[in-house]
Amino acid sequence: MLHLVDYALLKPYLTLEEVARGARRAEELGVAAYCVNPLYAPYVRELLSRVKLCVVADFPFGAMPTAARAALVARIAEYAEEIDVVAPIGLVKSHMWGEVRRDLLSVVGAAGGRVVKVIVEEPYLTDEERHRLYDIVAESGAHFIKSSTGFAEEAYARQLGNPTYSTPERAAAIARYIRERGFRLGVKMAGGIRTAEQAKAIIDAIGFGTDPTKVRLGTSTPEALRTLG
């Protein structure tokens, strides 16, 4: 099920040569999308034909002002098919829901119809915060809730009783909320998905089948998931 995989190379120390090599590998594997930082996107887009280019925005902190976030997303939308943007985490944790709503409406709107996955950073959230944020993501017109950047701080997550990695339980909870609310959102799980067994358990837990418009898995090690088919 490599057609559900977003192959991500997002470490800040990667060289252009390494990222270009990743693009060629993405094409060989036939993943859904190849996800990179904005700096590298113009260099690798010509290397992709059957694989979509995904670019992250305000990654990994979600701490830029709304105007800057929207401007960046609009620029990325000129050359990328998909955009993974981090939610304004500080505003979420401050429970400034009106500001969160204004931000995401502006940022998602700036994408001009490109596929947008909003990274909610599950490890940092309480259940109340999750649900309020999911509601706003749905209202914003985004296409996916994405679970995590994969860069979450373990010490803070532990204080909230949350893992920093993807689990079938968390995937099921997100999907269940989407179904109960009748949202037209997909689920992308990211963080610590390194085996085919993990991936299958998460896909099964989501319960949306194997449609890449509804289910994605983010990983930096797609080769490990090849046995999924």
Curated annotation (Swiss-Prot):
Keywords: Cytoplasm, Lyase, Schiff base
Enzyme Commission number(s) from the entry: 4.1.2.4
Phylogenetic classification of the source organism: Archaea, Thermoproteota, Thermoprotei, Thermoproteales, Thermoproteaceae
Protein name: Deoxyribose-phosphate aldolase
Domain of life per record: Archaea
Primary enzyme class: lyase
Organism: Pyrobaculum neutrophilum (strain DSM 2338 / JCM 9278 / NBRC 100436 / V24Sta) (Thermoproteus neutrophilus)
A GO term from the CC aspect: cytoplasm
Subcellular location(s) of the protein: Cytoplasm
NCBIfam families noted in UniProt: deoC (TIGR00126)
